[in-house]
């Protein structure tokens, strides 16, 4: 199975359209998979027995999730068959105090809980959602927050934050006349969204280091493509989708440490801390590692933390594992050179019409696109 589904440059779509993880048990012989992981990071591992029996690892086993059959693709949410994710995110790095953080959690929780009240088109899904009311209040910016404030503060905020959400869920579920949520917290991978607030993504350290190119994909019919081209951004056709263009944005993160400065054991340790004190669902974590220096530590790390996580995946560091990766590390000189070549984006052109594409005001807008009229 791992060989068949692993990434193949000659047939990339097969692996990219699947979630290549193994349902492991405590005591699995992880050494059998180290060579595959060192090649391209696959397979990942999920521990269904932990997901079914535990919420937070700081709390006793409760067995509430005995119906769980798997995870969502990024593995932050254990799910029953036909169950959906309901996710909302809080940025740790945007809070001035713990009180400010706890207040944000209230509104994040209320949004997530409200979404569980909305029916879907599938009757079987509605039944599961009404029974579980599962939500995933996620944190991002955890690694940089830990670097700046220390792990004791991280544990304190997480533990008190979790208990605060549980208190709100008890009160508001009674008020709404619905069940309390089976699980309420999680950690998403949060790659793109974290860029908006300058946060490190989810539980990860900055993948691209201090200076990097962030690859973001746009449909070829997206009017933004014309603006990026006019401004001189580096663009190239997506190698997988013929209808998609990859645009590379230069980023100076300014984070205290990047992923290459952090050991494999510290990375998995922070994920376990988050699973223990914050997330009663799961923690989406991809452990980057130095292929030459840390491959020998992969199996020991898994044996050490297999009972303290619900899922984990790996990725060798560097820019050559996969083409068109989300993050490509560059030097300061390369960053300055690229920034010097690009122009300021003319955002007003979206509404003035660009190359026969005109956005119809704010009609039918989602978070990503608006209705487009093709002249």
Regions found by a protein language model. Give the residues of each.
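Conserved, charged catalytic cores of large soluble enzymes
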Residues: 1-63, 136-166
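Domain-level cores of phosphate- or acyl-group-handling catalytic modules
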Residues: 1-12, 124-125, 170, 181, ...
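Short, well-ordered loop/turn elements at secondary-structure boundaries
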Residues: 10-11, 17, 29-33, 38-42, ...
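Catalytic alpha/beta core of large soluble enzyme barrels
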Residues: 35-37, 44, 54-121, 131, ...
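Inter-helical turn/loop segments and adjacent helix faces that build the functional surface
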Residues: 94-99, 120-125, 146-157
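Active-site-adjacent structural elements in folded domains
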Residues: 120-132, 179-180
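Flexible, glycine/threonine-enriched loop-and-boundary segments that flank and lead into catalytic domains
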Residues: 164-192, 198-200, 352-359, 364
